[in-house]
């Protein structure tokens, strides 16, 4: 366990344009929720924050496609994403919005502080303007023929076919990816740049001090810091209508009228603003004790969760904003980053509708099925792959055959022989003593993995704890003992029933609904076990045989789902 009693947890904030797929979920929100639930169960004070990332060109275009004003579209999609998060039992203390007044004010505040520190430069640059669209086009919204390979759908930042990096002016016959118009003009425009290069030494020292970070996190950070020309200054404003208006604190910024801050500047600041939103909502009383080191946050451990594509911004750009401000904001202590989850021999694709999206997943199965499979296959050290065959096999084996079967067998056996009450029986014997010793070791190992956020190892240990109980029940065989020694059968039954609240407490971070069902069936509360003594349920304690925890996935279901989610959303 961390030596601090308070942990701040943030998940990379999902973009507003549409519903996210399972690959997005397992790379940020879901493991963050696992860790938050675990720490709360162990008695820590936790603040778990997430939000929707609402600014930028894709939001404007998605709103136009939906026929809605962008503010209305973002409000609607925030509500949709919040409802889906509840469906997956994501236990955010607050699910905020980057378009909030709090984030506007805080983003403008940081920009002012950075400018005061000499870390903002005004840069004249050339950008492509589309007359038909009435807007400057981001590089990736310009298409044309690649001068290198001739691919006719190359984007203005890179050719997907030959991977050559491009500028929009390199393209042959360029056109707007929004309207298809070729009526384009290169115009001069002025933008603000964050002078990250001035903070390179400070950032390098800070990253080097994080010796406990995952290799994936530090390797990406150091690559961006050191490769090629090293850390580059970064544009933090855009010529758009929708976003945080450019201001220097509370004051107007001459020459920046009509511009907004770049989404990647304001989005991480929303982590802080989200806590301020939570105060307004009433879910917490004081946000600064979590975020300001001079106001109590010096005893906070801050952990971030994200996919590997977000690592450069969280290890360099956002820390540059924090450090450059010269103010005592809380910097991240640990960044848990993830590789990609691929889908059935290819990639998940939001644009092509390929793979399972979060709303669809909840339509076909309860959230615990998805939570268990995704977390037990979390892409921590390498990319992972979702296949329907593996999903069916693992869910049926782990959840139905091992955990669900154990709970069903022992509760139904007890009901048939002793009623729905924990029997008295004799004393425990060598089998029980051996299992308690084994479970004590496994409990310690499980907690070690959870403390270290080694998710796959933690899942494997939890599975082994379930298996140990199943093997005990099979070996002790109370149904056989009952024929010749009812007292011994009663002792076995009492012991095995006590495994259920033990399992419920340990399983709750992974499968909260099933854990709650186990606890309710045993007429007890969900609590984290201090040890494996298994004394929660005394003789005479009443219980109710719970409903089937996990139904098996049939071959017909698997085949139907594999066909349904092969491409193009319904």
Curated annotation (Swiss-Prot):
Keywords: Aminoacyl-tRNA synthetase, ATP-binding, Cytoplasm, Ligase, Metal-binding, Nucleotide-binding, Protein biosynthesis, Zinc. GO terms for cellular component: aminoacyl-tRNA synthetase multienzyme complex; cytosol. GO terms for biological process: methionyl-tRNA aminoacylation. HAMAP family: Met_tRNA_synth_type1. ATP binds at residue 350. Is required not only for elongation of protein synthesis but also for the initiation of all mRNA translation through initiator tRNA(fMet) aminoacylation. Its EC number is 6.1.1.10. GO terms for molecular function: ATP binding; metal ion binding; methionine-tRNA ligase activity. Binds 1 zinc ion per subunit. This is Methionine--tRNA ligase. The gene is metG. The lineage of its organism: Bacteria, Pseudomonadati, Pseudomonadota, Alphaproteobacteria, Rhodobacterales. It comes from Jannaschia sp. (strain CCS1). Zn(2+) binds at residues 146, 149, 159, 162.
């Amino acid at each position: 366990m961390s030596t601090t009693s308070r942990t701040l947890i943030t998940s990379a904030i999902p973009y507003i344009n549409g519903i996210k797929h399972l690959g997005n979920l397992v790379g940020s929100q879901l493991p963050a929720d696992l860790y938050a639930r675990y720490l709360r169960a162990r008695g820590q004070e936790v603040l778990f924050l997430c939000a929707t990332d609402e600014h930028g060109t894709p939001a404007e275009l998605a709103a136009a496609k939906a026929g809605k004003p962008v503010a209305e579209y973002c409000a609607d999609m925030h509500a949709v994403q919040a409802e889906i998060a509840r469906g997956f039992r994501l236990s955010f203390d607050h699910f905020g919005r980057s378009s909030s007044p709090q984030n506007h004010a805080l983003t403008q505040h940081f920009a002012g502080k950075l400018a005061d520190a000499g870390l903002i430069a005004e840069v004249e640059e050339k950008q492509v303007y589309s007359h038909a669209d009435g807007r400057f086009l981001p590089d990736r919204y310009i298409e044309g023929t690649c001068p290198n390979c001739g691919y006719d759908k190359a984007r203005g930042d890179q050719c997907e076919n030959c991977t050559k990096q491009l500028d929009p002016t390199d393209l042959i016959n360029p056109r707007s990816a929004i309207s298809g118009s070729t009526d384009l003009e290169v115009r001069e425009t002025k933008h603000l740049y964050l002078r990250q290069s001035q903070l390179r030494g400070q950032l390098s020292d800070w990253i080097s001090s994080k010796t406990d970070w995952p290799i994936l996190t530090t390797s990406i950070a150091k690559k961006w810091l050191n490769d090629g020309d090293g850390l580059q200054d970064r544009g933090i404003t855009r010529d758009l209508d929708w976003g945080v208006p450019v201001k220097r604190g509370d004051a107007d910024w001459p020459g920046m009228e009509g511009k907004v801050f770049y989404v990647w500047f304001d989005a991480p600041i929303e982590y802080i603003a989200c806590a301020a939103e939570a105060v307004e909502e009433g879910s917490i009383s004081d946000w600064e004790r979590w975020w300001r080191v001079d106001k109590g946050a010096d005893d906070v451990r801050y952990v971030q969760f994200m996919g590997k594509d977000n690592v450069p911004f969280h290890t360099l750009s956002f820390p540059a904003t924090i450090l450059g401000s010269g103010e005592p904001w809380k910097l991240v202590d640990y960044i848990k980053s993830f590789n990609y989850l691929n889908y059935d021999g290819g990639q998940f694709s939001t644009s092509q509708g390929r793979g399972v999206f979060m709303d669809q997943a909840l339509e076909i199965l309860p959230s615990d099925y998805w939570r268990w499979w995704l977390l037990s296959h979390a892409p921590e050290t390498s990319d992972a792959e979702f296949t329907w065959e593996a999903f069916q096999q693992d869910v049926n084996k782990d959840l139905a055959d091992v955990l669900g079967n154990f709970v069903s067998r022992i509760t139904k056996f007890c009901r048939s022989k002793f009623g729905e009450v924990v029997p008295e029986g004799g004393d425990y014997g060598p089998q029980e003593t051996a299992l308690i010793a084994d479970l004590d070791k496994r409990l310690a190992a499980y907690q070690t993995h959870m403390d270290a956020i080694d998710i796959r190892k933690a899942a494997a240990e939890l599975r082994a704890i379930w298996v140990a109980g199943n093997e005990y029940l099979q070996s002790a065989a109370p149904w056989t003992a009952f024929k010749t020694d009812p007292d011994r059968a009663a002792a076995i039954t009492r012991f095995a029933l006590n495994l259920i609240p033990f399992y419920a407490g340990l399983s709750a971070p992974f499968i909260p609904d099933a854990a709650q069902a186990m606890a309710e069936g045993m007429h007890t509360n969900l609590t984290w076990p201090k040890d494996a003594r298994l004394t929660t349920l005394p003789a005479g304690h009443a219980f109710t045989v719970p409903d089937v925890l996990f139904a098996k996935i049939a071959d017909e279901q698997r085949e139907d789902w594999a066909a349904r989610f092969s491409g193009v959303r319904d």
